[in-house]
């Protein structure tokens, strides 16, 4: 399963609109954990999100947890993956996908990952299954 920024933020921020859904889903997930995949761009987005809101300690705490987790594979976006993500970004001028979204979609397709932990509607628009279900 793919781990997106929006799920991490919802899980960590009590004020987030999706916080309760994230907590309920996470409690079920940790009973039967499975490997998660994310990207270094998602990691950077998450760190930037917290730090930009004056939550440097939270950025470090969550970042350290992700980096040390045996269940989370943080994929480095190589020049080849970046080129594919950039190509996808350019093709979808009708969408509001971020480059990080496009990189996530490319990694998911290459790794045959069909489900994402996310609250970002862009994943549904791109044809991915999402959890928790919208």
Where are these regions (language model features)?
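Acidic active-site catalytic centers that drive phospho-/nucleotidyl reactions
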Residues: 4, 45, 101, 120
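A general alpha-helix detector
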Residues: 7-8, 45-46, 84
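Short glycine/serine- and small hydrophobic-enriched flexible loop segments
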Residues: 48-51, 109
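Short acidic, glycine/proline-enriched helix-loop-strand junctions
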Residues: 66-78, 86, 92-94, 123-134
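Active-site neighborhoods of divalent-metal-dependent phosphate/nucleic-acid chemistry enzymes
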Residues: 73-115
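Acidic, PIN/NYN-like endoribonuclease modules and their adjacent C-terminal/linker elements
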Residues: 105-134
